[in-house]
């Protein structure tokens, strides 16, 4: 599902622990790290896509997390030209994302990257809330900055 401007609807997932760290996932067979994210299917709400992607990418179920906040609008990024599939129709030039801030309420050992036949990640770690800004690929950096900034006031840290 690609909108009339060429952007694919997508959800981004910022999963936090009790001390305010975020889950940072390593793309399979790469030294590239990012937050879990994934496309929204036809007739699927952003929240439904969130739970599906959460399960597919990190093995967690709805009962393992609590939604703390969601970005108000869509945040967009353009793909670098080298990643645009120019022979695909409709043409996708980037992603438009709704970002969700979640708190892990289930056990940490429930995080699993190997539950699907084609896993997207092969490792993960907890990092400080703002750490991803200096690490994510350049073309996603502004969306990460906007999402983290908007959602930061809703971050819950337990003593």
Curated annotation (Swiss-Prot):
Record's family?
Belongs to the Nudix hydrolase family. RppH subfamily.
One GO term describing the cellular component: cytoplasm
Q: Pfam families annotated for this entry? A: NUDIX
Protein name as annotated: RNA pyrophosphohydrolase
Origin superkingdom: Bacteria
What are the alphabetically sorted keywords of the record?
Hydrolase
Write out the residue ranges of the motif Nudix box: 38-59
- Domain (Nudix hydrolase) spans 6-149
User: In the Enzyme Commission scheme, what number(s) does this protein have?
Assistant: 3.6.1.-
An example of a GO molecular function for this protein is: mRNA 5'-diphosphatase activity
* Keyword Hydrolase attached: yes
Which InterPro entries does the entry mention? Nudix_hydrolase, NUDIX_hydrolase-like_dom_sf, NUDIX_hydrolase_CS, NUDIX_hydrolase_dom, RppH
Q: What does this protein do?
A: Accelerates the degradation of transcripts by removing pyrophosphate from the 5'-end of triphosphorylated RNA, leading to a more labile monophosphorylated state that can stimulate subsequent ribonuclease cleavage.
Please list the GO biological process terms of this entry.
mRNA catabolic process
Primary enzyme class: hydrolase
| Family matches, as SUPFAM superfamilies | Nudix
Cofactor(s) recorded for this entry are:
a divalent metal cation
């Amino acid at each position: 599902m690609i909108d009339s401007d060429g952007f694919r609807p997508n959800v981004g997932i910022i999963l936090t622990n009790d001390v305010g760290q975020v889950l940072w996932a390593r793309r399979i067979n790469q030294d590239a790290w990012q937050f879990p994210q994934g496309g929204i299917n036809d007739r699927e709400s952003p929240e439904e896509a969130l739970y599906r992607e959460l399960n597919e990418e990190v093995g967690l179920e709805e009962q393992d997390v609590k939604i703390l906040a969601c970005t108000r609008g869509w945040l967009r990024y353009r793909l670098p030209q080298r990643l645009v599939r120019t022979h695909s129709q409709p043409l996708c030039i980037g992603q438009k994302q709704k970002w969700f801030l979640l708190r892990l309420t289930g056990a940490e050992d429930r995080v699993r990257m190997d539950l699907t036949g084609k896993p997207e990640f092969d490792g993960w770690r907890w990092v400080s809330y703002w750490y991803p800004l200096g690490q994510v690929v350049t073309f996603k950096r502004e969306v990460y900055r906007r999402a983290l900034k908007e959602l930061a006031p809703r971050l819950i840290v337990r003593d």
